[in-house]
């Protein structure tokens, strides 16, 4: 039978893999995970401690009157981040990973507790209106979060990204790309899966616009921007980024081709990088006996 993704997540993360969490713990950070929903989702109550998080905060740790539709608001989540920052010891370095719930799909039900403020002009897509109205609320909450940390004395870095685009009425997509969801080129398909991100600091740092990247590189970009020396694995990723600026399970951005290719279409130096990346990922996740202590040192 088939196994759910959550099952794989729980089965494979049974001891502490090398990750941003283990790397930051090794240099003295307290690592905190926050998710304003049930702790059993994706077995987070098991997986997060296995990843090395020192603290986990789930739905019972939040004010459950701060609800939009059926979910705790981004504003409440950000206030909890601020609370945890304000309660930290004076010499405590904090890494807080937060996964929000406010804008989770679907978007077709009507709610008494949500006044939708954004409407498409000339198009009747209630689900799109609801989604855009939720994003509007997220913008306000994000303004609160950044304004708060703009004014603290400690250096702070915020890495902000979504995990996927919303699932909306299929009949809406021709208005976006002129084609809908079928017959798309690899580049057009990748566009549908592309999400925005930013890294913000409350200290002076050079503004850089990355035309394209992928989530596997965000921890490396965050460490670089924070001025933290890159562990060997992140240095590998920083070097790989020069040749393969974006990669996911479907394909990768090929500089030589000037667009997205399927993984199996890679040749030459691009194929070498992808092959070595596969070897390192396997070594970190599955190779219990021969794990490279250079790339994947155990938690000290």
Language-model-detected regions and their locations in the chain:
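Solvent-exposed soluble domains appended to multi-pass membrane proteins
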Residues: 2-300
